[in-house]
């Protein structure tokens, strides 16, 4: 579900691009130092945004340097990096979230690659759970709730269509059918948002409530963006997807995502952010839309809508 919270490179100066890479590389080094070389596979730009956000908000002591990178052996020049205490926390979260993403993949299709990744990350997750037990417990709670929501909807949809082989259960009772028809398309997204909000709020002091609100909105956006991008694959496969269940078109998905993005932007605007402000703006206001605009180019959405102009996120 991650990989959407990235910067719009076209909106950044060269110095901002270098700063972005340095914080990203700092997170990569923190993963290596705290969890070993293999944990670098957990690296994401999503948590890089979190580091930028916390460093700007709290202005902690930051260590900077340059190191050769085994992940990028060419060019041979050392790569600049920047780290703070928030980088270490982001590394812990990266491992925990990646492990549960792998568990989700195993539950979905059980392929060998996912099972191998689960085994490789199990030890690292044990270490992360010792370091951030409350956060890991929250991730476990939320992911279990999401699996229940997604599984219930899949089974309900199959039973309503009479696909007993797919569900291995009898057709739904009248009450169960009514519940299936009245399903809440926001339920799973809300759970993911609640989880990310609580992770964002940890150790934020005075700003805990605002950071939780930001994380909650961003989490809902991430979940829904993942559903939008997977729409074409999930339609024939029958995988849980709230947009498929609702029969949404590109413009309907765009409008729903814009509301979720606004829910993240409102608390973000209330934070006293100065350092890296333009860089973070390029992530939250335009970069997060990159994969959607690639899957659903605005001009294609307009054609689908009969050519009528629509309000849309920045490209």
What are these regions (language model features)?
Residues 1-192, 196-213, 220, 224-256, ...:
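Acidic catalytic motifs of isoprenoid enzymes
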């Amino acid at each position: 579900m991650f990989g959407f919270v990235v910067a719009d490179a076209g909106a950044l100066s060269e110095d901002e691009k270098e700063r972005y890479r340095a914080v990203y590389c700092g997170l990569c080094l923190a993963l290596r130092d705290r969890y070993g070389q293999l944990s670098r596979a957990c690296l994401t730009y999503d948590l890089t945004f979190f580091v930028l956000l916390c460093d700007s908000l709290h202005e902690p002591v930051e260590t900077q340097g340059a190191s050769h990178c085994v992940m990028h052996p060419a060019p041979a020049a050392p790569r600049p990096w920047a780290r703070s205490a928030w980088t270490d926390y982001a590394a812990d979260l990266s491992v925990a979230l990646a492990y549960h993403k792998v568990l989700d993949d195993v539950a979905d299709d059980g392929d060998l690659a996912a099972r191998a990744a689960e085994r490789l990350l199990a030890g690292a997750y044990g270490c992360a759970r010792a370091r951030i037990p409350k956060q890991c417990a929250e991730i476990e709670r939320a992911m279990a709730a999401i699996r229940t929501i997604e599984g219930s909807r899949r089974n309900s949809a199959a039973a309503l269509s009479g696909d007993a082989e797919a569900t291995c259960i009898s057709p739904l009772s009248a009450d169960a059918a009514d519940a299936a028809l009245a399903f809440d398309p926001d339920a799973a997204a809300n759970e993911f948002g609640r989880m990310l909000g609580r992770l964002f709020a940890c150790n934020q002091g005075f700003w805990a409530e605002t950071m939780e609100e930001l994380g909650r909105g961003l989490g809902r956006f991430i979940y829904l963006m993942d559903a939008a991008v997977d729409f074409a694959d999930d339609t024939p496969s029958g995988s849980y997807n709230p947009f498929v269940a609702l029969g949404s078109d590109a413009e309907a998905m765009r409008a729903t995502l814009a509301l979720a993005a606004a829910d993240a932007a409102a608390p973000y605007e209330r934070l006293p952010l100065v350092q890296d402000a333009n860089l973070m703006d390029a992530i939250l206001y335009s970069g997060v839309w990159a994969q959607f605009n690639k899957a659903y180019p605005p001009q294609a959405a307009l054609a689908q809508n009969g050519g009528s102009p629509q309000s849309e996120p920045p490209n």
